[in-house]
């Protein structure tokens, strides 16, 4: 079952563990959206944080060309991917479960942006119950240098050096022109993920985890987003791990990271249940 075009992995909860943690309530379905170039074995480590809590997890990472080329050049290819991922919830008959997102870097955040837009506007998806989101090492705004570092890391040492520099130069010119120089014009038909999520944010609780040592995503961009959302009256919290590199928070601080994610999920579930109870009274 599911969409053959998507390279995703789903792990269903174990009944005994779910019952222990959620005591008769439907267990959360956690959607993990990987950073550009992340492999499923990387995401599986994060997935286990939630599987151990009796959650069902759905893991997906958008292809590199979609993140770095299509999105940078204004093609909304990720929007159709977002639609397919949300449809999977219906394919696997978990559309009535609480939904929780765990999003990594700009690669995951760009895809998350379209999922949020669909949850706002699409008749079918608007009935889904999203309880919260964890954002790891994102979002970054118009950071060409950071994007180049991310692309260089993703290409890796196997790519010919001359080809690597050519691709980096081409990417830099395209992004600089379309997303910075011409952005006052291009934003009218393709707003960047940062501005889109600042202007039309997700209404549910959010937690931003980041590091001021991150050389790909500027920590000030994350803090600006957090402050902007808090000023809109949203439930948003954040934590600066200070020393880890980009998307290395869990690797460097596994216990602290896991505890924060689990505690936040429990808090989101409790908050969601309280809101539902108030609606029924």
UniProtKB/Swiss-Prot annotation:
Predominant subcellular localization, coarse grouping: nucleus
UniProt keyword terms in alphabetical order: Developmental protein, Membrane, Nucleus, Transmembrane, Transmembrane helix
Gene Ontology cellular component annotations, sorted alphabetically: nuclear membrane; nuclear outer membrane
UniProt keyword annotation of Acetylation present: no
Regions that span the bilayer: 165-185
Pfam families: DUF829
InterPro entries referenced in this protein's UniProt entry, alphabetically: AB_hydrolase_fold, DUF829_TMEM53
Protein location: Nucleus outer membrane
GO biological process: negative regulation of BMP signaling pathway; negative regulation of ossification; negative regulation of osteoblast differentiation; regulation of nucleocytoplasmic transport
Membrane topology, record value: Single-pass membrane protein
Source organism, top-level taxon: Eukaryota
Classification via PANTHER family: TRANSMEMBRANE PROTEIN 53
Functional description taken from the UniProt entry: Ensures normal bone formation, through the negative regulation of bone morphogenetic protein (BMP) signaling in osteoblast lineage cells by blocking cytoplasm-nucleus translocation of phosphorylated SMAD proteins.
Similarity section: Belongs to the TMEM53 family.
Protein name (database record): Transmembrane protein 53
Organism annotation: Danio rerio
